[in-house]
Structures are given as C-alpha cells and as structure tokens.
Design a protein with these regions (language model features):
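An N-terminal assembly and electron-transfer interface module characteristic of large anaerobic redox
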Residues: 1-502
Length: 502
C-alpha cells in the first residue's frame, strides 16, 4: 500500500478533515497529531513537527507539505511572525534532510504568497490592520502601479497621504515581513532546481489585479524563468484546497493515470468571470488546477474521464444584489447544465460540480434542482465553499481521487459533508446566527466569547431542522451530528458526522 504523508496548512477542517474524507481507498494517508499544529495566530510546534516529519517520511512514497506550516507554524503565523531570515532558512533544511534519508520519496510542496486583504480587520492579520489594513492594501496597489509605469500626479498625492496616515513603525513591520517571506520563497525554488522538491504550487491567497501580491508574483516568475524550472512550479489563486490538489496528484502518479477532464459551465459567459478575491478569469485558474492534479483538459465528452461542471453566472455577486435576475437568470441556464451532467453519468463519466455562483456559500437554486432531479447522489463530487479556487480544487481533487479508487463509501460521505456544510451551514444557517449575534453582548461573528455554547446550539438546531425539512434524502444518511467552531468564530464550522449503515 502506497504511503502519502501530509503536513497541512493548519488544523481547520478544510486542511485537516477534508483530506481524510477524500475517496482514497487503498492509500495509507498519514496525518500529524492535531496538537502539534497551530491554531489561528498560535504557531505550530516546529520541533515536534520536524520530529514527526523525519520519522513518518522514512518509508513514505510521497510527502505533501505546506512550507508555511514547517517554516512559520501555519497560514496566519506566516503573516504575523517575527522570525529572522536565518531562523527560517534553518527550518527549511528539514526538506533536504527528508530527501537525504529517503531519496526515493517524491515531495510535493506548497508555499503561499503572503496576502494583503483590502479591508481593515486584524482577525487573521497583525493587530494594526484594525487601524489601517485598507490603507496598507492601497499603499501596495500604488507601489505596484508605479512599478508598471502607471503613476499619475493624483496617485502620487494619494500615496503621500497614505504614508502620513499609516504608522511608520507598523508599515516597516509589515514591509519587512513581506520582504523576508518572499526571500525565503525564492530560496525554496532552488529546492526544485536541485531535485529536492519534485512539484511546487505557489498559491495566491486573496489576490488582486494590483498590489503586494502582484509585486511578489513578478519576482517569482522572474526567478522561475531565470533558472528554467517552469515545468515543476505553478502559481495561481488559492490556498486551503492545495493539500487536496497535491494528494490527488500523488494518487494519479501512484496509479500512473493522467485523467482527461472536460469542463462545462452553467453560463456561456461564466468562463470569463474574475471571481471575488482573485486576479484573473476563472478559466485560466481551471487550467492550472487541472494541470496541478496531473490531468489534461479535453473538449469532447466521448474522450473524457471526468466532467467538471462549474456553476457560475455572468458575474459573481452577493446574494441580495439587484442584478441577480440578469446575472443568474437571463445569463445562466441551470436546467441544461444539470441535464448535461446527467447525460455524462449515463455515459459512465465521473461527474462533479464546483458551485462558484456565489463567494463563501452554495447556491440554493442549484441544490433544489439537484434534489428535484434526483441528482444529489448521482454526481460524484460537489463543493461550494469560500473562494472560487477553494471550491474548484476541492471538487476536482475529489473527482480525480474517485477516478483512481472508486471508493463509493467515502464518495457518498464527502458529498453529505459538503451539502451539510457548504449549503446547510454556509448558505442558510450562518447568516441567521450572524444576525442574532448582533443582539448578544460580548460576542461578534469573529469572536463568540461567553455566548459560544448558546450560538453553537442555535447553529446545530437550525442545521438539523433545515436539512430534515428540505433535504430529507441527505438527512437520512446521517446517524449523528456534532458541531463546533474551530476558530471561535462563525465563518467556518467543524462537523463530525456518523452515517447509517445502508
């Protein structure tokens, strides 16, 4: 049995639980103990992570590793740490040690370009982002525009006002950290050139057309071109789905498969949409995602192994936008979309849906149509959570793994998790409890405080009731459900489902 060792980005469900739910029958997928991983702003234990990695990779065939976890202790600590470049370089040597003790192991790594969100909130950023996060983001945009020869007198004047507004020491702290993070990323590219890392994904978390992320992307591209390592390093929007993607790539290599993927959109204009928090049209990201799993895109249904259905309108809007009728009504045809996917199943194709019509939740209209057409469990994968790239990677990885393993039990269970979480919680329940939190003293949606148990019970009751009332086919597969808020906020929920024997 082939062994894949995973060091995830952190221990949130999307990084720690989702990989365990993949249809991976016949694969020994090895995870670190949760207690050595970080939690939000608390970094993971480097010493214990190093010990665990060196032990578990001795006899492993593949290592899927988040370098943000190894080097910084997790996705958020990478944005707030005060490690020196020398300290980080010492930690990076662990990757070479792993290859030295097991020269046959294939190492698939990922390392993020540090994000700079466009809003003022310190929930996952340095504390001073509460004061001027939006202004730091704008500062980065103007720096990028100047680098690209787009500076104007108006932008120069705005830049001067930003410099005066942002505390000098805080800005220096932020810029110094970005400089160190990109420096170590560029150094780690040499691990690819030196055959230590076999495949490297550089995801862009919350990217934008202009800004710090764009500046760092150019540095990475220049470095890749300089050392001629283009084939084994790719860079595209994403973050929390990348562990799934690299597991799928490993399983394809284990089975010597290169899955052929047909892409179908619910809107003819959908492929040209630039999703929220991303810097390019979705179809360009789809190409990278297919390449990342080790697949190839094809245009004919007859030759494909997998049909990736992408539910999207002619734009990506929020739920209550007044343009919804045009974007999701006139410019999209869900009936023919579902009809085509059903046709694919009749041809024995593996079929899944990446539900990216809205950011951060599922599309209820799609779920109702799938229910009415008896398609909820005819499809082989579904996701509709957080960003477009998160959803695309989750769906595609699940389809790819199922193509290799035909693990029916896990396939059904993962579908159920996604319907409960992406639709039931994120689309229905979360808004209700967020509105109720406004009436509770000492709680916000970013910190539940003393009302944690009260809010958790409310979430459980609402989720249980909604699925039982409106999606009985899904509800009937579940025996017990436990819920928790892993980061003490409402943005994500952790589900623990047990299933009825059928």
């Amino acid at each position: 049995m082939s062994k894949i060792v995973l060091l995830p980005l952190d221990k949130r469900p999307c990084n720690y639980i989702y990989p365990q739910l993949l249809p991976t029958d016949g694969i020994n997928l090895c995870f670190p103990p949760k207690n050595i991983l970080g939690k939000k702003k608390i970094a993971g234990d480097f010493v214990k992570i190093k010990e665990w990695l060196l032990e578990e990779t001795k006899d492993a065939d593949f290592l899927v590793i988040s370098l943000d976890t190894l080097l910084f202790g997790g996705i958020v600590p990478a944005r707030i740490n005060h490690l020196t470049l020398s300290e980080i370089e010492d930690r990076a040597k662990v990757v070479t040690l792993i290859k030295q003790q097991n020269p046959q192991i294939k190492i698939f790594a990922n390392e993020l370009i540090m994000r700079c969100p466009s809003y003022s909130l310190s929930d996952e950023e340095p504390d001073y982002f509460d004061l001027y996060g939006k202004e730091i983001f704008r500062y980065g945009q103007i720096v990028d525009m100047e680098n690209q020869g787009m500076m104007t007198p108006e932008l120069a004047e705005e830049f001067e006002s930003l410099v005066k507004f942002i505390d000098r020491n805080d800005l220096k702290d932020y810029l110094d950290r970005r400089q160190i993070n990109i420096a170590i990323l560029l150094e780690n590219l040499h691990l690819v050139a030196n055959k230590i890392i076999d495949f490297f994904i550089i995801p862009q978390d919350d990217s934008n057309e202009f800004g710090f992320s764009s500046v760092d992307q150019k540095k990475v591209r220049d470095h890749i071109n300089k050392y001629h390592i283009e084939n084994n390093i790719i860079m595209y929007p994403g973050a929390d789905e990348v562990g799934l993607t690299l597991i799928a790539r490993a399983i394809n290599q284990i089975n010597n498969l290169k899955p052929k993927v047909l892409v179908c959109y619910s809107s003819s204009k959908g492929q040209f949409v630039v999703p929220s928090f991303e810097d390019r049209i979705i179809d360009e990201t789809v190409k990278y995602q297919i390449y990342a799993i080790g697949g190839i895109r094809v245009d004919a249904c007859a030759e494909c192994d997998i049909i990736l259905g992408i539910n999207i309108g002619s734009q990506m809007l929020t739920k209550n936008d007044k343009r919804s009728d045009t974007v999701y009504g006139k410019n999209r045809n869900l009936l023919t979309f579902i009809d085509y996917l059903e046709y694919g199943k009749k041809l024995n194709k593996i079929v899944g849906i990446a539900d990216v019509a809205y950011c951060n939740s599922a599309d209820e209209e799609l779920l109702i149509l799938l229910r009415n057409q008896k398609m909820l469990y005819k499809i082989d994968a579904y996701a509709g959570w957080n960003t477009s790239s998160n959803t695309l990677g989750t769906t595609l990885s699940t389809l790819s793994c199922y193509n290799c393993t035909r693990d029916e039990k896990k396939k059904t269970e993962f579908l159920t998790y996604r319907y409960y979480e992406d639709y039931g919680y994120m689309d229905i329940v979360r808004d209700v409890i967020n509105n109720e939190i406004l009436t509770l003293e000492g709680s916000t949606r970013f910190f539940l405080g003393n009302n944690y148990d009260l809010i958790l019970k409310k979430a459980y009751d609402l989720l249980e009731k909604h699925m039982k009332t409106h999606f009985l086919e899904i509800y009937d597969k579940v025996d017990t459900m436990k819920v928790s808020f892993p980061w003490n906020r409402t943005f994500e929920i952790m589900l623990d489902l047990t299933f009825k024997d059928k």
